[in-house]
């Protein structure tokens, strides 16, 4: 059932012209800015660092901006009530949707790497392709679980989309996509290591460099499952409150 729901939503999102533009073109603006900045160092390793980080930024952007307004869109179309009263647990309805959203971020990942190769001559060496792909898959799944939690947290707010947008740029910095964590104060590092994308990004870079990404992969997956469990518990609490106070539609 989860696989069917995931595949259905993935096809719907992939067929959307808006989502396609958002996933491919929009991240290229920020990737180009990063490439131009890092090119000033004249260090090939710096460009590779920026290339990998920019490619994963798009996946985070998808979740931060679209998952936060997921339930709000269902509310606008009048289908939120139908999802809530479905016999399937509400968490099992949302997880395939956010996973499909995160998977669509592969558009951004591929487009950014190709863009960097063609326009800036950035070649990202991948020493271990299998572990590289595994790291990407685990990162996508963990980021999707963050999106699931985020969609539940902001469901009671009319401006959920704005709250999600606020998380996009801080996530780029805190998760180490473009700026090494060593440049930040210690308290920022503690926050960073509580987020799965930080470990996922480290795993991707380690696999590309030929290192061992296993610890980072396991930490990314473990934290993602923790966020998923929190989202499951919170979703039931939110639904009980909405039913009791008749506030699901926010009208």
Placement of each model-derived feature along the sequence:
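Hydrophobic transmembrane alpha-helices and immediately adjacent juxtamembrane helices
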Residues: 1-251
